[in-house]
Amino acid sequence: MNLAWPSALLLLTAWAAQADDADKLRALGGGVFTKGGAVAEISLNRSRITDDQLKLVANFANLTDLSLEQTKIGDAGLANLTGLAKLEWLNLYRTQVGDVGLAHLAKLPRLQHLPIGETRVTDAGMAHIAKLKRLVYLGLRGNKIGDAAMAPLAKLPKLTGLHLGETRLTDKGTIQLTALGQLQKLWLHDTRLTDASVPQLAQLTQLKSLYLHRTRLSVEGVRLLQKSLPKCRIFYRSATVPE
């Protein structure tokens, strides 16, 4: 008996199961993309995927990119993703995910990009986010988070992009942001920031883009900030800083 046959049969069975799961995901309105013969990216944006059906995704061990934007996925669904050890990019924008679900994300060791704006996430969930030490981008736009969320986020050593637009952030919260000296892009538009935040923001010397439109900063305050950050393009009142 050829001992290689059982192994080959197992591989063939696993491949057939993945092919079947991929077909089911496509039937729900998703896109499944391969790289090097293995499924590496799945897009289910605006699809009919449910929490229970997300078990189909869990079978793709080589998955690096998963997008669930504008779906009904909630906390229970994220429990199905904890085995995706290679996942680097997870889009949860406009889903039903809340703080409980973030505890599941803390088990994804390679996660680097996490757009999770306009969800049910609050300040309480940031303690879980703080465990994702490889995060490069975090999008929290439109969530009910404020100054209390900043201390946990300040513990993310590789974060270069942070979206806090349309949140409850105030000048007090920017004090914690100074710990993120590696930030290159920062969205703070549609917040209650005033000129009192200028000294703190001026310490983020690696910034390349800063979005401050529809805040309470004055023209003079923004001009002063621009002088402190000459290499940063500041967007103010839907335009760049006035001359």
For the regions a language model picked out, list residue spans one by one.
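Bacterial N-terminal signal peptides that target proteins for export
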Residues: M1-S7
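N-terminal hydrophobic alpha-helix used for membrane targeting or insertion
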Residues: S7-L9, L204
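Charged/polar, solvent-exposed surface patches and flexible loops
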Residues: L10, D23, A27, K227
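Hydrophobic h-region of N-terminal signal peptides that target proteins for export
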Residues: L9-Q18
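Short N-terminal segments immediately surrounding and downstream of signal-peptide cleavage
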Residues: D20-G36
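Absolute protein N-terminus
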Residues: M1, A19-D20
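Concave beta-strand-loop units of leucine-rich repeat
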Residues: G37-R223, S228-E243
